[in-house]
Amino acid sequence: MEIPILSELKLKGIEPEVIFWVGCAGSFDDRAKKVTKSFVKILNNANVSYAVLGNEESCSGDPAKRSGNEFIYQMQAISNIELLNSYNVKKIVTTCPHCFNTLKNEYPSLGGSYEVMHHSEFINTLLRENRIKISGGSFKGKKITYHDSCYLGRANKIYEAPRDIIKELDIDLVEMKNAKSNGLCCGAGG
């Protein structure tokens, strides 16, 4: 699977539409790596002009901030912001709710102002623009539920984009007792 690296595109004078911020989990956690690969397939199928930072990407700093180490957080964040600004990045998409929240809501106070989207929002946009299509396939007639992550849901009020995508699968979306703003934390940090 070929994944464009921002520094290489810049050397060729190519400005990608969006930067895919992979994040620590998306790079190292086996389960999250599957999400990363699947999202890259979607980007490629939709002919999205995108790039990743590759070896230049560092942790967003969220774990340091959440564990109370503001110094380490700011060092990581400022380093990332300087890198992103040096590339004149305007739009970032990420699959990680923690990275999403940090890049969108915390980086601006340190000089990093970007349009930041969660991949569910980005995929939903691709669907609305007819850049990708989903066929119901083997999901027809099945029931599914969706868990709202803390940082995507309650922290950023993104509830409908994931559900809109699920509805495209031609399945029966069944809401949990505690959903959306009443959702419960899964305990896994996302």
Model-derived segments and spans:
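Iron-sulfur cluster-binding electron-transfer modules in prokaryotic oxidoreductases
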Residues: M1-G190
